[in-house]
A protein has these predicted regions:
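Glycine-rich hexapeptide-repeat left-handed beta-helix
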Residues: 307-457
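Catalytic metal- and UDP-sugar-binding loop of GT-A-like glycosyltransferases, i.e.
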Residues: 30, 101, 436
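Conserved core of the sugar-phosphate nucleotidyltransferase
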Residues: 60, 68, 108-191
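N-terminal nucleotide-binding beta1-loop-alpha1 segment
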Residues: 1-21
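Catalytic-core segments of class I nucleotidyltransferases/pyrophosphorylases
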Residues: 148-239, 244
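Conserved N-terminal catalytic core of the sugar/cofactor nucleotidyltransferase
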Residues: 1-7, 33-118
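Extended, small-residue-rich solenoid/repeat segments and analogous flexible loops
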Residues: 206-313, 322-324
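Glycine/small-residue-rich pyrophosphate-binding loop that anchors the diphosphate of NDP-sugar donors
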Residues: 168-172, 263, 392, 410
Length: 457
């Protein structure tokens, strides 16, 4: 095996007691993605020989949630970071090197890791930081020449060592040829009663192997998550970085501090996004699109020159060019809108294709339907697509005029240029160019007197 072969071990077995959650800590999300999944993606970008993820607490939840091509290794007892890496040993190459990452350090990036790997070479690499407050973190101990000699955990540190501000981030590069021997010689004789991975630094020094420290360029890149406050802080840093990149690329964000991107955004020119917009999953937005305040959009494609008015929700849908959506509109999965479509307030569309120029401006439900072009839905139109057991399809042709407060009971077909009278319940097919009326005849009672409160029976 070539000396440069790279294995990566991601430690993700911890319970995360301070998260106060039944969910394993590493499944809590940053930018819409579980933390451990984000770390796996970063690791994969380094093109390693393999990636081993050590899991323990909540392993079934982790396996059910994270679908990545990695080697899963179970740590049945949580006996420390050194013990965790030891469980992965059977899956590591005899030669080369191993990079140790953490499933609760979600913002580590490939650039930092590449710098660390280059500095380490075939020896030991250590990522360090100098935070404003090092309390609770392992200190980097150096000799008089400035060489790293050990890492001392705060619970085991004396007053002099606690005064050191440079800390261990936990991210290490280790030579595989030495790893098994070093891990096998670890002791749990410390304040925690655990096998510390950090003790390998002293073992490397004792074996004459140089330790190459690399200071991270920004503390948040190596920051771990132990509670919901830290999770929220890293989420805001992540979102700020996303917003900055979009602004540099020409997207207008009315308030970058009130914008969330929880996925991937592909955008055209002159896109404008108002406050409190949440974008999730894979989003594609064309030129000159405007998204109003308080919209939530997930896995959607929006064509050029379309306007999404405030408080609209779009999910797993396609919107053509020059559309007007909302306010308070909802496009559910498999809604497919052609160009020049208007969908107004309190209109819901699900599993339906809508033809060019069609309008449903208010208070309408369109489900499991195929709708032609230039059709108009009057206010209060409902497609009754469910019989209590099965969903049924409705087909509506071109230039249909559906009166207000109509119910179309599926399965039913309306031909081209059909008109339905307001208040009709349409249960049978209607041929082209026909008028359909299906409502009770109005009756006016002459001489009727409305009862008033207090009238005696």
């Amino acid at each position: 095996m070539a000396q440069t072969a790279l294995n990566i071990v991601i430690l993700a077995a911890g319970k995360g007691t301070r998260m106060y959650s039944k969910m394993p800590k590493v499944l809590h999300r940053i930018g819409g993605l579980p933390m451990v999944e984000r770390v796996i993606d970063t690791a994969a970008a380094l093109n390693p020989q393999n990636i081993c993820v050590v899991i323990g607490h909540g392993k079934d939840q982790v396996l059910d949630t994270v679908k990545r091509d990695v080697v899963w290794v179970e740590q049945t007892e949580q006996l420390g970071t050194g013990h965790a890496v030891k469980t992965a040993l059977p899956h590591l190459a005899a030669e080369g090197r191993t990079l140790v990452l953490y499933g609760d350090v979600p913002l580590i990036d490939t650039s930092t890791l590449e710098t660390l790997l280059e500095a380490a070479g075939s020896e030991v690499g250590l990522l360090t930081d100098v935070p404003a407050d090092p309390t609770g973190l392992g200190r980097i101990i150096r000799d008089s020449q400035g060489s790293v000699t050990a890492i001392v955990e705060e619970k085991d540190a004396d007053a002099t060592q606690k005064a050191v501000r440079e800390i261990n981030t936990g991210i290490l590069v280790l030579p595989n040829a030495k790893l098994e021997n070093w891990l096998g010689s670890l002791s749990s004789n410390n304040a925690q009663g655990e096998y510390y991975l950090t003790d390998l630094i002293a073992k490397a020094v004792a074996d004459g192997i140089k330790v190459h420290p690399v200071q991270v360029r920004a503390s948040h890149l190596a920051a771990g998550v132990n509670n919901k406050l830290q999770l929220a802080e890293l989420e805001r840093i992540f979102q700020t970085e996303q917003a900055q990149e979009l602004l540099k690329a020409g997207v207008t964000l009315r308030d970058p501090a009130r914008f969330d991107l929880r996925g991937l955004l592909k955008h055209g020119q002159d896109v404008v996004i108002d406050v409190n917009v949440v974008l999730e999953g894979d989003i594609e937005i064309g030129d000159n699109v405007e998204i109003g305040a308080n919209c939530v959009i997930k896995n959607a494609k929006i064509g050029a020159n379309s306007k999404i008015a405030p408080f609209s929700h779009l999910e797993d849908c396609e919107v053509g060019q020059n559309n007007q959506i909302g306010p308070y509109a909802r496009l559910r999965p498999k809604a497919r809108l052609a160009d020049d479509v208007h969908v107004g307030n309190f209109v819901e569309i699900k599993n339906a294709s809508i033809g060019k120029g069609t309008k449903a401006n208010h208070l309408t439900y369109i489900g499991d339907a195929e709708v032609g072009s230039k059709t108009n839905f009057g206010a209060g139109t409902i497609i009754a697509n469910y019989d209590g057991v099965n969903k049924h399809k409705t087909v509506i042709g071109d230039e249909v005029r559906i009166g207000s407060n109509c119910v179309l009971v599926a399965p039913v077909t309306l031909g081209n240029k059909v008109t339905t009278g307001a208040g009709s319940a349409i249960t049978r097919n209607v041929e082209d160019n026909k008028l359909a009326l299906a409502r009770a005849r109005q009756t006016v009672i002459e001489g009727w007197v409305r009862p008033e409160k207090g009238d005696k029976k």
